[in-house]
């Protein structure tokens, strides 16, 4: 029996806490390996790509949380091993530098040239002993012209070179070719593809992992048919799988069932409407 009340258990399920699963662990291990590499002038990096909702941002936030900012009172210095920032809505260098400065708590007010923002950002990042720069939503660069995309990617490469830091970018499938368009950057970034979930053992393990994390008091022995229903309803998108399992677990607690049943899976109604989401096709096998 749980020591928490039903309300406390439900609040915990609804909370934004990390639930480890195999695919995410593989990416995190790759990122950890980059962090543990000796610093050099041209650090290797990684591009993690896949459909929207597949878990990229979740993984990025988890990685950043493993290397939190630390303040050394004796030295009066702040060390930030990893900086996670979101790409601006369009490939805009000024906005990107402003966002970096705001994220690290050093905003520059008033009008400044891109060069001034760049110098200030680099100065702070060097002082923070940055080892990895992670850019989420890198596909936002597609909102710009070809020339703007090239300039933005060149800026990212310059930052990584100047700081001797690993560059890690996260984006949807469509961003892959844009990043590959910068030959020098593409050679530095290994690629890790996160596909949609399929009807296989890996998906079964994911569901088992998620249900176990819900800490229900009874065992949920779902049939293969139920697993396929979950896959069909969610379209194989990680975020929707999480939403569905969490919703079913909350229902199980509220009703006193304390387990997710086949009947509950079949009866579950998605919180998204059928016309509100489109699952893109998997990229060609060559991208895997």
Give the positions of each predicted feature.
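A short hydrophobic beta-strand->loop->alpha-helix junction that borders the nucleotide-binding pocket
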Residues: 78-91
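Pre-Walker A adenine-sensing motif
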Residues: 28-40
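The feature captures the helix immediately C-terminal to the Walker
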Residues: 61-65, 242
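Mid-core helix/loop region of P-loop NTP-binding domains shared across ATPases and GTPases
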Residues: 2-5, 28, 92-96, 107-155, ...
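The catalytic "switch" region of P-loop NTPases
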Residues: 142-144, 152-225
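Post-Walker A helix-loop "phosphate-sensing" segment adjacent to the P-loop in P-loop NTPases
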Residues: 65-76, 106
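C-terminal alpha-helical "lid" subdomain
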Residues: 2-6, 11, 20, 53, ...
């Amino acid at each position: 029996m749980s020591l928490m009340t039903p309300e406390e258990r439900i609040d915990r399920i609804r909370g934004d806490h990390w639930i480890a699963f195999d695919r995410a662990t593989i990416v995190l291990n790759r990122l950890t390996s980059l962090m543990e590499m000796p610093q050099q002038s041209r650090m290797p990096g990684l591009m993690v790509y896949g459909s929207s909702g597949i878990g990229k941002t979740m993984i990025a936030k988890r990685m950043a949380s493993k290397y939190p900012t630390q303040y050394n009172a004796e030295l009066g210095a702040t060390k930030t091993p990893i900086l996670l920032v979101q790409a601006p809505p369009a490939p805009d260098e000024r906005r990107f530098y402003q966002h970096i400065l705001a994220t690290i708590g050093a905003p520059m007010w008033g009008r400044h040239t891109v060069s001034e923002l760049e110098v200030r950002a680099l100065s702070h990042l060097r002082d923070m002993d940055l080892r990895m720069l992670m850019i989420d939503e890198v596909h936002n660069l597609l909102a710009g012209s070809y020339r703007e995309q090239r300039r933005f990617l060149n800026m990212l490469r310059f930052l990584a070179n100047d700081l001797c830091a690993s560059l890690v970018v996260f984006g949807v499938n469509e961003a892959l070719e844009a990043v590959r368009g910068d030959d020098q950057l593409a050679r530095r970034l290994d690629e890790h593809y996160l596909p949609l979930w399929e009807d296989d053992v890996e998906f079964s393990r994911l569901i088992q992992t998620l249900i176990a994390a819900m800490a229900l008091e009874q065992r949920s022995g779902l049939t293969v048919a139920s697993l396929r229903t979950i896959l069909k309803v969610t379209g194989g998108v990680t975020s929707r799988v999480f939403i569905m399992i969490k919703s079913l677990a909350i229902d199980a607690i509220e009703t006193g069932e304390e387990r997710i049943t086949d009947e509950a899976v079949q009866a579950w109604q998605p919180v998204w409407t059928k016309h509100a989401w489109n699952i893109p096709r998997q990229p060609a096998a060559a991208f895997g």
